[in-house]
Structures are given as structure tokens and as C-alpha cells.
Amino acid sequence: MSAAKPKTAKKARAAPAHPPTSQMVVAAITALKERGGSSNQAIKKYIAANYKVDINKQATFIKRALKAGVANGTLVQVKGKGASGSFKLGKVKAGKTEAQKARAAAKKAKLAAKKKEQKEKKAAKTKARKEKLAAKKAAKKAAKKVKKPAAKAKKPAKKAAKKPAAKKAAKKPAAKKPAKKAAKKPAAKKAAKPAKKAAKKPAAKKAAKK
């Protein structure tokens, strides 16, 4: 039994005696329902009456909770500055700020998605351009390789054309030989002329007979 008592004491120490200060402040303002807002003193009185709290020690935490509530939008300061003055709940404004945050987050997400799409489109365009340029370069290189063997093949054609010209030049002297033989034939006719002179001699014999 003596060992079980310390365990129950530890559980009592671990359990908080009151909720967080911000929750107590909101509860005080909602319970007071003052049109002009609840003052810091009224909030302290409500917390001291409804919660087991040392209000002197909790005063600094209450001031911090009020300032933080105004900054977050959960509270609205109607009068005064800082922790002094009167405060109301700012649920409507808080809801608006949350909605605005959600809208801003949605807009940011849309902008991010658009930027990603634009980047992807630009990347695709650059890739397509690079591929086209690479294809053009490859086609030009292939065309150059095809043109070089064609130029080499033309040179043997020129050599083949020159050889028939040499044969034609060789045939021309062969055609001149018959022309020389034809020129020799008139010489044979000249040798036949003395034969005619020899035929005239019998006429001289006829004169002697007379």
C-alpha cells in the first residue's frame, strides 16, 4: 500500500491544474459578454474565480495572451494599447484571416504549378530545337560524305574520254596512205606516152615508098 501512494501523487502532479492561459482568456471574454469589450481586470477576476490559479503569478501570462491574441486575430482590442484596455473576440476576423491564408496558399500552389508547366514547356522546346539542329548537322555531314565519292568517280570518266581521242589520232595516218598510192598512178600514164611516139614511125616508112 505504501508503494501505491507515491504513484497517485505523481499522477496528480502531472495533471495540469488549469488550461492554457490563452484558453482561459477566451473563456473569460465569452462568459462576460460585454458589448464594449472586457477589460484586463475583469478577465483576471473571472479567471481567479473559475480556475485554481495564483492570479498574481498569472498576471504576466494573461498580458502575453492578450497581446498574442490581438496579433493572431483571435482577439480585438477595442480600447487602450498593449495589455490595457478592453478586448473582444475576433472569431469573424480570425476566420477571414484563415480564409485569406487558404486562398493565398491556393494561389501560391497555382502559381507554382504554372511555373512548373512553363519550365517544362520551355525545356521541351529547347530539346526539340536541339534535336532539330542535331538532325540538320547529321544530314549535312551525310550529304558531304556522299558528294566526295561522286567527285572521285568523275575523274576516271575524264581519262576514259581521252583514250578514244588518241585512237582517232592514230587512225588518221592510216587514211593518208591510200592518197599516196593514188598520186603514183599518173606516173604510169606518163610512161605510156612514148608508146604513141613509136606508133608514128610507120608513117615515115610510107614516105620512103613514094
Curated annotation (Swiss-Prot):
One of its GO terms (molecular function) is structural constituent of chromatin. Residues 17-91 form the H15 domain. PROSITE patterns: H15. Residues 114-123 have a biased composition (Basic and acidic residues). Keywords: Chromosome, DNA-binding, Nucleus. Coiled coil: none annotated. Pfam families: Linker_histone. Residues 1-21, 86-210 are annotated as: Disordered. GO terms for biological process: chromosome condensation; negative regulation of DNA recombination; nucleosome assembly. It comes from the Eukaryota. Residues 104-113, 124-210 have a biased composition (Basic residues). The keyword DNA-binding applies. GO terms for cellular component: nucleosome; nucleus. It is found in: Nucleus; Chromosome. InterPro entries: H1/H5, Histone_H1/H5_H15, WH-like_DNA-bd_sf, WH_DNA-bd_sf. PANTHER family: H15 DOMAIN-CONTAINING PROTEIN-RELATED (PTHR11467:SF20), HISTONE H1 (PTHR11467). Belongs to the histone H1/H5 family. Histones H1 are necessary for the condensation of nucleosome chains into higher-order structures. This is Late histone H1. The lineage of its organism: Eukaryota, Metazoa, Echinodermata, Eleutherozoa, Echinozoa.
